[in-house]
Amino acid sequence: MRSAQVYRWQIPMDAGVVLRDRRLKTRDGLYVCLRDGEREGWGEISPLPGFSQETWEEAQTALLTWVNDWLQGSEGLPEMPSVAFGASCALAELTGVLPEAADYRAAPLCTGDPDDLVLRLADMPGEKIAKVKVGLYEAVRDGMVVNLLLEAIPDLHLRLDANRAWTPLKAQQFAKYVNPDYRARIAFLEEPCKTRDDSRAFARETGIAIAWDESLREADFTFEAEEGVKAVVIKPTLTGSLDKVREQVAAAHALGLTVVISSSIESSLGLTQLARIAAWLTPGTLPGLDTLHLMQAQQVRPWPGSALPCLKRDELERLL
C-alpha cells in the first residue's frame, strides 16, 4: 500500500551568502517521503535561486502532481531537474537502490582572511584538498591568495571555482600571479571564462587544468576528452534524476575524467544523500559538500559531527 507525505521548509542562512549577485537570506525547499508497506524513502527538492531554471513554487506544483500520480501507481519521473532528483532519491531509498555507505569527507570551502586559512589548512588531517571561490574580487587578488596558500602549504591541492566570472584578460591576470611551479597543485579551475572556447584557451596557455560545471547543463554539451580538461563537477539538484547523474558519471569516467559530486546548498538531509551518492558513484574522490555551515539549522537527518540544531519531521510544514 503506497502512501506519501510532502513537507515545505525554509532555513535561515548565515549573513553574507551571495549567489550570482543576490543575497540568499533563506534556503527554501520541499521533502517528499514515500512509503510502500514497511519501506520508506526520502527525497529533497530545493531549486537553487539563480542556478535552477524552475522556481520553488513551480517545483512544489510539479512535485504534488507527481506524488498523486505515484500514489495511483505511476512509475514515471517529473521533468524538472530538482523534482526529478528528489523524487528519484526517494524511490532509490524506498527500493534499496541507494546504498547506506556515505563519504562524509568534504573539501573545505575556504573563505575569510588568507593568513587564518593557512593556519586552518595546515592542520587538516590526511589528504589536503580545499576549495576556493575566485572571481568575486579582483583577479589579481585571487591569484595572490591562491599563490600564498600553495606556497605556505606544500602538500595542499586546491579546487578553484570561477563560475564563468572572467574575461580572457582577467583570467590571464589571475594566472600571472600564480607561480608556474605551483600550478600543478591546482586540481582544477571550474569554468574560468564566460565561454568554453575561452576556458579551453586559458588551460592551454597557462597549464592550469580546468573543469566543466555549468557546461554540463547546456544543450550542446557532449562529454569529450580534451586537452587541459581534467574534471567535471556534477550538481545533482541541477542535473535531474539519479539515473541521469549515473549516466553522466559513467560517461566522464569512461574518458578518464575526475567526477566530483557537488552541493547546490541542500539541507542536511539532501547533503547526507549526496554523501551516499558520492561514496557509491565516485569512490575515492572527495565530494564538494562543505555548505552546511552556511545554514543556521539542520533538518530530519543530521550531518555527522555538526553542532547545528536539527529539526524533526513533525516541526516542518506538511502539505500532503
Curated annotation (Swiss-Prot):
EC number of this enzyme: 4.2.1.113
Annotated Mg(2+) binding sites: 161, 190, 213
Catalytic activity: (1R,6R)-6-hydroxy-2-succinyl-cyclohexa-2,4-diene-1-carboxylate = 2-succinylbenzoate + H2O
Pathway: Quinol/quinone metabolism; 1,4-dihydroxy-2-naphthoate biosynthesis; 1,4-dihydroxy-2-naphthoate from chorismate: step 4/7; Quinol/quinone metabolism; menaquinone biosynthesis
GO biological process terms, semicolon-separated: menaquinone biosynthetic process
Keywords: Lyase, Magnesium, Menaquinone biosynthesis, Metal-binding
Matches recorded under SUPFAM superfamilies: Enolase C-terminal domain-like, Enolase N-terminal domain-like
Molecular function GO labels: magnesium ion binding; O-succinylbenzoate synthase activity
InterPro entries per the UniProt record, alphabetical: Enolase-like_C_sf (IPR036849), Enolase-like_N (IPR029017), Enolase_C-like (IPR029065), Mandelate_racemase_C (IPR013342), OSB_synthase_MenC1 (IPR010196), OSBS_N (IPR041338)
UniProt cofactor(s): a divalent metal cation
Active-site residues, as the UniProt record annotates them: 133 (proton donor), 235 (proton acceptor)
Similarity comment text for this entry: Belongs to the mandelate racemase/muconate lactonizing enzyme family. MenC type 1 subfamily.
PANTHER family per the UniProt record, alphabetical: O-SUCCINYLBENZOATE SYNTHASE, O-SUCCINYLBENZOATE SYNTHASE-RELATED
Function: Converts 2-succinyl-6-hydroxy-2,4-cyclohexadiene-1-carboxylate (SHCHC) to 2-succinylbenzoate (OSB).
Name of protein: o-succinylbenzoate synthase
Gene name in the database record: menC
